[in-house]
Amino acid sequence: MNFVYLVVLCPLVSFCLLLFFIDYLPKMLVKKIGIVSIFISMIITFYSLFDFLNCGKQCVFYIPLWVWISIDYLKIDFNFMLDGLSITMLTMTTSIGFLIHLFSSWYIKLQDEYTRFFSYMNLFIASMVLLLLADNLLVMYIGWEGVGLCSYLLVGFYYSKINSGYAAIKGFIITRIGDIFLILAIFFIYKNFGTLNFRELKLIFETTNVVENFKFLNYVSLFLLIAAIAKSAQVPLQTWLIDAMAGPTPASALIHSSTMVTAGVYLIARMNFLFSLSPIILYILGIISCLTIIMSCLSALVQKNIKCILAYSTMGQVGYMFLALAMKEWTLAINHLVTHAIFKTLLFLSAGAVIILLNNEKNIFNMGGLRKKFPMLYFSFLIGGASLASFPILTSGFYSKGNILFSALENNYYLFLVLGLLGSVLTSIYTFRMIFLVFCGAQKYRAHYVFFSRTLANTLPLLILILLSTVIFVLIHLPLSSVFSKTTPSFLINNNKLLFEIGCSVLSLLGMFISYYLFLVNRMLVDLLLNTKLGNFIYNFWYDSWGFNSLYNILCVNPYLYVAKRLKHDPINIFMSIPITFCFFVSKNLKYIHNGYLRVYVFSIMFGLFLFILMAIRLYK
């Protein structure tokens, strides 16, 4: 357990090596450094996990490193904490990170910026691991900023393309809004409680009457909520996530599965003792999550880009995690987070393979019939999509999402339940729409196939993820009992749960059959609807992310551009030139006094002497 700091150090050292020797290392050595460092971190994580489980689920390990800040009464330690939540997230991040790295060695092998890609990916994982292991908010903030920086670097990886640069800047600025509110929350927490340590804060909230300062708790909870929804791409700060698809597909898989997007969920789960005392903020969180679920599902229904569909699906599934958090079902949220990380990685890697094999074709309407050409990719995409759509009995997503929805029923959150079930149907429709258009029907591809050679790098990650996306993962129990007081919901033995699961199964299958009918059997019906004015308006409205991009352009971008255009000529110079003009005016008029005539000088002396005598007489009196 004392070696857990190596989980951060290994990818960090590999990042430094790859960055400093970017022009000197051969591709084979770059691949070994990048992958082996993450593999070592994963092995150490598994060793720590087994050690943690052997000590009992109630154990919490503290790894002291050094005193970071010590100024008078301000003392911040740079220490690590390993409890059930952090070890769960750590295992997920390093394991999925290793599989993505392994797949990336095949995916990006023909590109020139091989070294730069692996250096960014390793820094990304190091930052996320630091965020997860931090025992206080300030150390966590370093990792929080680190994943934001790495997301910017990876989204803008193809910097020669102007759209990639714009997408990277957009994502960085929007998530920066959340970063500002997070640092404000950190300041307020330290000012009122004198500590940023998670353990000490939890003890304060459990042993003292902090409810008296009700407004303060709501303000801090609101600031943390804004930070979380910005990082996890929830309404209304969700627009950056779709543009983030400009980066390489393995980077998108890492962002969406186990790092950037999940950081907001982890933040709220880690600060659960604070949010438990802010029911108003939790209800707002529930409303935001439901809106995100519905809006993302409807937007995914009209997308053509396969990566954009997966991006909207991430928004929706993270919405379910936030819905669980809003109902104080912390364990269910983390369970769905881990489940989603697995099948979403599977979907992104499969989509990446399809894209690279079709010469970078991303439009699903230009694909079709790929199941015959690539049965392995079809099977992996089918399993991942089925888990995303909560296909009954066989998939892990059916149980993790079903538990969240049943919790809404048990706790009388009927609005959340109805919207969550509607989102489940819509998820099934757009997921199988994507599968049917890409892998079924007639072959519509225009590009020539690239030869798909099965290697360990592009096959093993898919096989492992396929296995974990099934019901097998349900047998794995996450060690969260020491973190959350409510870890075993009573409805697990409720007889009504069987009926509820049957209902969810019917809805999932209904969505699949609707998708089959609309996009394989009777495509003319969809075309007929889109040809109407109303249908075309709705299509464009959903396609443009419900007008959020246009709204932000009007409210933020256009005023900024207007001010920048005005400041281009520096209007301050107008005011600064006034003293200069006055000095020139005075100088111009004073020069007429010095004209060289003696009579003028004598008159000036006499006049000055006369004024001096008058002043002296006045002062004497």
Swiss-Prot record:
Chief subcellular location: membrane
UniProt entry keywords in alphabetical sequence: Cell membrane, Membrane, NAD, Quinone, Translocase, Transmembrane, Transmembrane helix
Organism name: Buchnera aphidicola subsp. Baizongia pistaciae (strain Bp)
Role this protein plays: NDH-1 shuttles electrons from NADH, via FMN and iron-sulfur (Fe-S) centers, to quinones in the respiratory chain. Couples the redox reaction to proton translocation (for every two electrons transferred, four hydrogen ions are translocated across the cytoplasmic membrane), and thus conserves the redox energy in a proton gradient.
GO CC terms: plasma membrane
Reaction(s) catalysed (UniProt annotation): a quinone + NADH + 5 H(+)(in) = a quinol + NAD(+) + 4 H(+)(out)
Subcellular location: Cell membrane
Pfam families: Proton_antipo_M, Proton_antipo_N
Coiled-coil regions listed in the entry: none
Biological process terms in GO annotation: ATP synthesis coupled electron transport; electron transport coupled proton transport
Entry's transmembrane regions: 2-22, 33-53, 59-79, 80-100, 123-143, 169-189, 210-230, 249-269, 274-294, 306-326, 338-358, 374-394, 412-432, 460-480, 500-520, 537-557, 597-617
Descriptive protein name: NADH-quinone oxidoreductase subunit L
